[in-house]
Amino acid sequence: GGIGKGYAVERAMQILQGAGIEHAVVNAGQSSIAAIGHPPDRAGWMVDLGVDGTGLGEIELGDSSISASRQGRVPMAPGDRGYGDIIDPARGRPVESTVTVIVRILSATQADALSTTLLVLPIEEGKRVLEGFPGAAAVWLSATGDVIAMHRDIRAPRWKR
């Protein structure tokens, strides 16, 4: 979470590219994924986002990164409802959101940081933040997988560098 997995994915991609590899996917547990190039028979890599029923269950990913953030609950005792692992810095308390945010952008580090940031912010404020990242797209999903909001089309298969 945060930016750690995104940074690790980005570094792995840099190492692969430095070794001359032009086509690859690095997947760090479904929530942080980056791709370069494409498989021989497609324009991009098919990536399952694990959000069935939204039309976003599987997208084509090429030369970009994707990150998903949602509030998990960590129980502290048997029968406890649990506490969230993402903290709202303005309140100093766990985020109460049941939303999942998925961000797509070239940099895996930025994707990871943005998806967590957008989970904390109100949607309209999050969209304003995204305006500072011209290549970024995002989707906010409800706990039942319904699309609440979208900023640009996250399904676009390729992103310009």
Predicted feature residues:
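Mature catalytic core of soluble alpha/beta enzymes
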Residues: 1-161
